[in-house]
Each structure stands twice: as C-alpha cells, then as structure tokens.
C-alpha cells in the first residue's frame, strides 16, 4: 500500500473559502477558458453545480458573445 503524506500549504492556513463572496468567485471563474472550466468541474460538487447552473452559463454566453465583435 502506498503511503500518502499531507502537504502543509501556508497559503491555505487561516483562509476560509466560505468568506469569499460568491459574486467574486463567479467573476474569477468567468475568466477561465472553456478547457479549464471542463477540467475544474472535478474540483468539487459545488464547482460542478456552479458551472452547470443556468445563471453561470448565461453569464458566460453574454461575456463570450460580447468579446466576439
């Protein structure tokens, strides 16, 4: 059996992701490429449901269609 070792990341200490406003998270996620969105759906159930939500897909469509001028 392979042993795994927990990595201590100083960037994660003291940071509670629930404290980040959802709108800010959406703004960041909307800047991702389609390839990254497809890959990041596996991060968590919350991210998967966010990427699949009608609200997110409509925002993504509006942003992408406004950039193709």
Curated annotation (Swiss-Prot):
<dbReference type="Pfam" id="PF00646">
    <property type="entry name" value="F-box"/>
</dbReference>
<protein>
    <recommendedName>
        <fullName>Putative F-box protein At2g33705</fullName>
    </recommendedName>
</protein>
<dbReference type="InterPro" id="IPR001810">
    <property type="entry name" value="F-box_dom"/>
</dbReference>
<feature type="domain" description="F-box">
    <location>
        <begin position="14"/>
        <end position="59"/>
    </location>
</feature>
<dbReference type="InterPro" id="IPR036047">
    <property type="entry name" value="F-box-like_dom_sf"/>
</dbReference>
């Amino acid at each position: 059996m392979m042993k795994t070792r927990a990595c201590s990341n100083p960037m994660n200490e003291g940071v509670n992701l629930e404290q980040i406003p959802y709108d800010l998270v959406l703004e960041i996620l909307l800047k991702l490429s389609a390839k990254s969105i497809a890959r990041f759906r596996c991060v968590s159930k919350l991210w998967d449901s966010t990427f699949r939500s009608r609200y997110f897909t409509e925002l993504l469509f509006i942003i992408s269609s406004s950039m193709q001028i």
